[in-house]
From Swiss-Prot:
Residues 2-18, 533-555 are cytoplasmic. The keyword Transmembrane applies. This is GPI-anchor transamidase component PIGS. It comes from Rattus norvegicus. Coiled coil: none annotated. InterPro entries: PtdIno-glycan_biosynth_class_S. Heteropentamer. Part of the GPI-anchor transamidase complex, consisting of PIGK, PIGT, PIGS, PIGU and GAA1. One of its GO terms (biological process) is attachment of GPI anchor to protein.
Length: 555
């Protein structure tokens, strides 16, 4: 009986050891890896190598230029060499990591019969009407017509002409170096109509160091999918002035045609409002000599903040908001004039603030006070007002007056207020700006994810990153081929996808849950199970070790 009981006890001990070893093996080989896998931070793979390669991206902006030579524009020997292609490339000297080169591909050919007839007319506008085929010209392309040196199409003192469409006219010459001399003139004209250092520097103002390229006047509106424009009439003295403005007619007649032409760069929404008892917040200075009031240039920045609080918050808007304010000064401060830095009155009596909008002071004719009781009825001249606001709108979008070469006649814009090549130039600038923004966003995101290992990278975030990288590469290729429309669309997609990835809220889910907190939470859960297993393993180890050291009994 004693032997049977001892055998049962030994069997129970062996069974307990095996159970302890089994539980330990399951916990270590299955439980621990399963826990580690289920609690790890999911990070979808990203194209880090391609993102780092974006820092060394070189942009080649190709502008296709078709050069058409009429009879007697160059010597006969040179005409026999037509057609052929000449490429002019130069690097834009900007202090930016992205190297930008402008490539003008000039395709020389002879004029067709209808082109000869049009260019033989006596008026450049008649010639343009016959030559105008804007629907056949691709975005970003230019056509330059070279006419005879003695042609009466241009004034005798003018060597070139830039039209409202994608066309220009340059005088030729009978000279053995005609192609070289005319080629330089064509480059100067083409640069004025497309890409200059100023245009690209303004587009990259947020990415360049603080120097002459990044002053406030060179900071146009940032590229966006849409813009909201608000026209506000400020009447601080309704007891004296009963102001009426036909803003709907003014917008439809003057602003909407401009926005329709600009629709390729984004969507626009326009609204208006009238604010009573809205003061500027700055006390104007009285000038006894002219019996008028004035606002000095240094006080203009202080005008915006008090007024902005009355305009309504733009925080809920997804797009940039442009404010255009028409201010009718109160009777006690009339007339009111804005002064420039030299103290002289500004001709338009208006000023604009980059990326915010503009303010115009509209003085009431003092003659109406004599024959009328207060409040006097004030009819706003919308043509005068909208002319100023339209000029400010051009400046806010970075559509400045081009720097034309010497002896160049510049045509004014059509009724839309925007020339076709100005729109192309804006799209060039916006494409470069979008690529710079997208590459900066992707690089910053890659650096952030590399430094903080517990940021979750979901599959949809990774897909946005891949889409942004592909769009950047597609836009760069389209720019190199001169396909402006597709390049701009791809650059917009690059910015949108990169910002969606960067600002995705899922990136912050585990940002404030570091590894030490993970162990602090799970150790109390695992400790009650781990202590018995560990004690059993220690006991088994000690017994096994003791049995090995126990000497064998010799009979």
């Amino acid at each position: 009986m004693a032997t049977a009981g001892a055998a049962a006890t030994d069997l129970e001990v062996v069974r307990g050891k095996r159970a302890a070893l089994f539980f330990a093996a399951v916990a270590i080989l299955l439980g621990l890896p399963l826990w580690w896998k289920t609690t790890e931070t999911y990070r979808a793979p990203l194209p880090y190598s391609e993102i780092s390669g974006l820092n060394a991206l070189q942009l080649r902006l190709m502008v296709p230029v078709t050069v058409v030579f009429t009879r007697d524009s160059v010597p006969l020997d040179d005409q026999e060499k037509l057609p052929f292609t000449v490429v002019h490339e130069r690097e834009i000297p900007l202090k930016y990591k992205m190297k930008i080169k402008c490539r003008f591909q000039k395709a020389y050919r002879r004029a067709l019969e209808h082109e000869e007839e049009a260019l033989s007319l006596g008026s450049v506008h008649e010639a343009e009407a016959l030559l105008a085929e804007p629907e056949k010209q691709a975005e970003g392309s230019l056509t330059v017509y070279v006419i005879s040196e003695h042609s009466s199409l241009l004034p005798q003192d003018m060597m070139s002409y830039i039209g409202p469409e994608r066309t220009a006219i340059v005088r030729g010459m009978i000279h053995r170096e005609a192609f070289n001399i005319i080629g330089r003139r064509i480059i100067h004209v083409a640069q004025a109509m497309s890409l200059t250092e100023d245009v690209l520097a303004a587009a990259l103002a947020d990415h360049l160091p603080e120097d002459k390229w990044s002053s406030d006047k060179r900071r146009p509106l940032k590229s966006s999918l849409g813009y909201e424009i608000t026209f506000s009439l400020l009447n601080p003295d309704p007891k004296s002035h009963d102001v009426h403005w036909d803003i709907e007619e003014g917008v439809q007649r003057y602003v909407q045609p401009f926005l329709n032409r600009l629709s390729a760069a984004g969507n626009f929404s326009v609204d208006s409002q009238i604010l009573y008892y809205a003061m500027l917040g700055v006390n104007p200075r009285f000038d006894p000599a002219s019996s008028s009031y004035s606002l000095a240039m240094h006080s203009l920045p202080h005008v915006i903040n008090p007024v902005e609080s009355r305009l309504g918050s733009s925080a809920a808007s997804l797009y940039p908001v442009l404010n255009f304010l028409l201010y009718v000064p109160e009777l006690a401060h009339s007339p009111l004039y804005i002064q420039d830095k030299d103290g002289a009155p500004v001709a338009t009596n208006a000023f604009h603030s980059p990326r915010w909008g503009g303010i115009m002071v509209y003085n009431v004719d003092p003659k109406i006070y004599n024959a009328s009781e207060l409040p006097v009825r004030v009819e706003v001249d919308m043509a005068q007002v909208m002319e100023v606001f339209l000029a400010q709108l051009r400046l806010l979008f970075g559509i400045a007056q081009p720097q034309v070469p010497p002896k160049c006649l510049l045509s004014g814009p059509k009724s839309e207020g925007l020339m076709t090549w100005e729109l192309d130039r804006l799209l060039w600038a916006r494409s470069v700006e979008n690529l710079a923004t997208a590459t900066t966003t992707l690089t910053s995101l890659a650096q952030l994810l590399g430094k903080i290992s517990n940021i979750v990278i979901k599959d949809d975030v990774a897909s946005e990153v891949y889409r942004a990288v592909a769009a950047v590469q597609k836009a760069a290729e389209a720019l190199a081929l001169g396909h402006l429309s597709s390049a701009f669309a791809a650059s917009q997609e690059a910015v949108t996808s990169s910002e969606r990835a960067f600002f995705d809220p899922s990136l912050l889910h585990l940002l404030y849950f570091p590894d030490d907190q993970k162990f602090a939470i799970y150790i109390p859960l695992f400790l009650p199970m781990a202590v018995p297993i560990l004690l059993s393993l220690v006991k088994i180890f000690l017994e096994t070790h003791k049995s090995w050291k126990k000497p064998e009994k010799i009979d």
